[in-house]
């Protein structure tokens, strides 16, 4: 993960006795000079802060009143929740409870919490109490430092997945949780330290300055410092879940053609997208266009002729958008140059902005077989998901950068041995070869070497997909398969016609004699061709339900099923 945002608490974290530590202020300015965004996130009111912050502005945004008020440079304050309920304020006054009010927050001594709870219950108000050391704050439900920070970053066009938060007290829990790394200071709340990703050592705000400068020296947060966010790979034979920490690592997914490797990679993408990571997916064959069914995903066709690369670069820089770059319509000979251009662009953007968070390269052996141009693959930044069926054709530098290896079925001995050579822990080559060849279509194995696998292989059943998946859907709709894999329509053993694409089959069905259609259906020929040549098990199952039915109904059902799946007219 490339740091892009620094979210800092005020009292007890960067400030003591109402004043920001001078060394922390210098470190914050140094971070801004490098392009890091800095956000102050505090329970204090803006008027209170204005009396204590002096000199040039240190922050790109201030989230005040524990997430309820936002200030951006050159703009008036923005309230992110409604103001205090007048009935609530009246009851506080009637009971003589000392308090201070901001634009949205009501602040009081923590000792009066029981009385305030009784007032909230009696008035049936949707209010929450947050404690901060010896004080408490009352705000509407759902308002906290995390919600305020997320609003600030949305307006700054930045992501919590590039953010590091530092805090010291009870009201910092949500902020540390929502950021990619949450750091608690060693001199603060014990409960916060227990839940934090890491601890800032030291005994006062000056230590935060050292922590900031250490971050500035890093192009990427090391994977071992990141482990909270995970994706589900699947389940073991005993039903135990197997998870993989995201950690910004480069992950290699290898396996034979039609073995389920794109399905596996797609499952990882779905989970990352739903955790609001921004992905850039280089999709040579249209395998991942189905991800557009998920929120925040856009499929962008790249054919090299009508592609606006300037507009595409703007899309890539959006922190809340995942892109599937569909190259299936590009001429095969043009794809290496197109992918190289795209990789150079996306790698530069990741260095500059921290997004996209992850880059998937399918059929990676075609595009990363040599690293003559270091801009094609950022070895230092990492964060790639590489999918390949020819591990032997990948650059050795790319292979060495892989930090977790997932394998679907492999029958090719040479490819299997190359995969096994990447990791320790396989007792004998014969044992590893047997394992990889024995995997079912819905199984995979996490090879030894990663933190999660330890020193042994972890075999698992792949987690279900959320979006429908069709292997090479766009390619096989229009691009002819080899002659030896075409569908031959026959009657009494004599050929009547041929189909080399899905659209050929769809166009031929209305013209075929009923007995030819019924014969192929009864023998399961259509289903086997769809499953074995195209690897489309879902459509194959739909066709199975038509086998043995009335010819006219079956023909119409077959045409509808294909048209719904691949596009085109069913009638």
Predicted feature residues:
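Mg2+-dependent phosphoryl-transfer enzymes with acidic/Ser/Thr/Gly-rich catalytic loops
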Residues: 1-3, 21, 139, 146-227
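Alpha-helical substrate-recognition element adjacent to the catalytic core
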Residues: 1-82, 105-106
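Walker B catalytic acidic pair
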Residues: 10, 284, 362-364
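Short, well-ordered beta-strand core segments
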Residues: 31, 62, 182-184, 199, ...
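HAD-like small-molecule phosphatases
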Residues: 50-154
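P-loop NTPase catalytic phosphate-binding loop
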Residues: 227-358, 367-385, 389-393, 398-401, ...
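Conserved ATP-driven motor cores of ASCE-family P-loop NTPases powering translocation/secretion/packaging/pilus
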Residues: 383, 390-452
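Terminal, compositionally biased segments used for targeting/anchoring and flexible tails
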Residues: 431-571
